Amino acid sequence: MKFNPFLEAIKTYESGKDMDLVAKEYGLKEVIKLASNENPYGTSKKAKEAIINNAHLAHLYPDDTMSELKQALAQKYDILKENLIIGSGSDQIIEYIVHAKLDHSKAYLQCGVSFAMYEIYAKQLGVKVYKTPSLTHDLNELYELYQKHKNEIKVIFLCLPNNPLGECLDASAVFEFLEKIDEDCLVAIDGAYNEFASFKDSKKHINPKELIHKFQNAVYLGTFSKLYGLGGMRVGYGIACKEIINAFYKLRAPFNVTNLSLKAAVAALDDDEFVQKTLENNFSQMKLYEDFAKNYKIRYIPSYTNFITYFFDEKNSTDLSEKLLKNGIIIRNLQSYGLNAVRISIGTEYENSRFFEEFSKNF
Amino acid sequence: MKFNPFLEAIKTYESGKDMDLVAKEYGLKEVIKLASNENPYGTSKKAKEAIINNAHLAHLYPDDTMSELKQALAQKYDILKENLIIGSGSDQIIEYIVHAKLDHSKAYLQCGVSFAMYEIYAKQLGVKVYKTPSLTHDLNELYELYQKHKNEIKVIFLCLPNNPLGECLDASAVFEFLEKIDEDCLVAIDGAYNEFASFKDSKKHINPKELIHKFQNAVYLGTFSKLYGLGGMRVGYGIACKEIINAFYKLRAPFNVTNLSLKAAVAALDDDEFVQKTLENNFSQMKLYEDFAKNYKIRYIPSYTNFITYFFDEKNSTDLSEKLLKNGIIIRNLQSYGLNAVRISIGTEYENSRFFEEFSKNF
């Protein structure tokens, strides 16, 4: 059977290892996963209750207007419901961006190393990718490339803070950059971890309302998968002017988010205590990872997220990840990003102590 | 801002009315929804328990290999896990079919009136649609159109039984038809309601194993949204030879199904009692709808599904649907399919009695 030729260029995405499968494979009693930047404090109590209280409604199709969650997000950000689209994770909004603006004759721009899904979706359409020489976000380099290829570049992805490297631009610098970009180029501000950055340093805070009111060509991406502890429920969102939201809506399949996910997300937004605890613990535990790296003379970039990335000079990140895996610690090897580095999600105090223990033994 | 030109041709999908919103709008205490073919007996006890017992894991990304659910489905159908792909509803598998095989230079074929999502996905790519003159499946007409346009037609959708009309072809006739279709044309057998048809008449039963072993160009679609009572959880699947599954996998975004949906689906497969009760009650209640139609001299097609479609000669289906809506009964008006007809999901005994009551008053 012949398939559309563009499929040939697509590699099938291979996901990280599941904890249960790792436990079985290596005969382990305990497996600690510090690989997917999930919330180490679990699901918020309110979100869990919302799921349990609505489990008996699992037979009913979701409210496809998603009005309850849109109302809650509109209130949080002081925007209109018409400025919102909800996706199966913010990944799905990335997919809409790529499909609405790009094709094989166009290009998108990102820094040297950023979230893998931008490129995965772009390659599905044969879209060209421009990356800056610097791995982290450098606005001068980004602007230089944009200027040189502005006829092709119709989307720019800025990941603030950046996954998998952890650095973050100041909001003021981003707004200045946006002033220089043509109105026909869509600029996506991926704020999947922006709450973490904002907590550490308010200068990093992107205000979606201000963003979309100043720039008709900007879209802000948010998610419930990280701070809000709902990685398994697949809920993210895009915030933009109505014109952009309407275009994305044309690409959305009906019922793209489950009814329990919608209920859980509404409840999670209301759980301030859980959010505060997560943010505070994250950065107090992050300090331990920084101190640990200094002790072992490991290079790292100060992180504005819920993970930290260690770079190696002599040791091989693949060997190290595999050794840790066999001892029940899953971290993310970054060789697939072309880096001899690992990304470690900041876990609970206990999980982190286990990481330090196993890492010390195997480093 | 300019978007890709193909977006202009796409109409935004408008979903059915949500019960809570209808209740608010019309100030109703009770709203009965017989519009989306959901399971009127709710969520199976086992599935509900699986959701409740796993709610505390909502922060963890789903196992993207989906091995537990694939194992359960492989066992149910006596096939390999490699013959399976899981989607966010079987809708998502329809999307993969369209995107893997079709573009603006190709066409797909269906009977006169069938599931709306085939055409919605096809239009996103500017794909041509051929429909038979007959509203219901007529294999001779389908074959005639196929023969005439076989250079263009690269996908055929057969909906067995057919949504929204309810009729169903015999499996033996479908297999004979498949013998005559070229290997490069993908034939999708949409079995979303096939369990209902098989229960009523075993001649309607499509055996996915037999189908894919005989035909390398066939894909079977199944869902957990109807019989298995998980419409809100968005789980469906495709069964085909490995070559087709591999092509679809290239189009799949990671984590396309929530972790609680996977757990619920595994549990639902194991709840035979719930499934049996649903099937038995469905057809005993269906009989009441047939008798009711005969009394009122309303035309209907004998249904092999969990819904029945009433056709009107003089009354207008839009007026009637609106009258019922104001009285708290939501049914599906089929004017958008070009039919002066309504589709009514078979509900519980009480729900159906309320439908008969309000229908009698307003007809």
Swiss-Prot record, chains A, B:
Pfam family, one: Aminotran_1_2
GO annotation (BP), single: L-histidine biosynthetic process
UniProt-listed CDD domains: AAT_like
Annotated positions of the N6-(pyridoxal phosphate)lysine modification: 226
GO molecular function list: histidinol-phosphate transaminase activity; pyridoxal phosphate binding
Source taxon at top rank: Bacteria
EC number: 2.6.1.9
Names of the cofactor(s): pyridoxal 5'-phosphate
Catalytic activity: L-histidinol phosphate + 2-oxoglutarate = 3-(imidazol-4-yl)-2-oxopropyl phosphate + L-glutamate
Keywords: Amino-acid biosynthesis, Aminotransferase, Histidine biosynthesis, Pyridoxal phosphate, Transferase
Pathway(s) the chain acts in: Amino-acid biosynthesis; L-histidine biosynthesis; L-histidine from 5-phospho-alpha-D-ribose 1-diphosphate: step 7/9
Assembly, per entry: Homodimer.
Family to which the UniProt record says this protein belongs: Belongs to the class-II pyridoxal-phosphate-dependent aminotransferase family. Histidinol-phosphate aminotransferase subfamily.
HAMAP family the record matches: HisC_aminotrans_2
NCBIfam families: hisC
Designated name of the protein: Histidinol-phosphate aminotransferase
Source organism (scientific name): Campylobacter lari (strain RM2100 / D67 / ATCC BAA-1060)
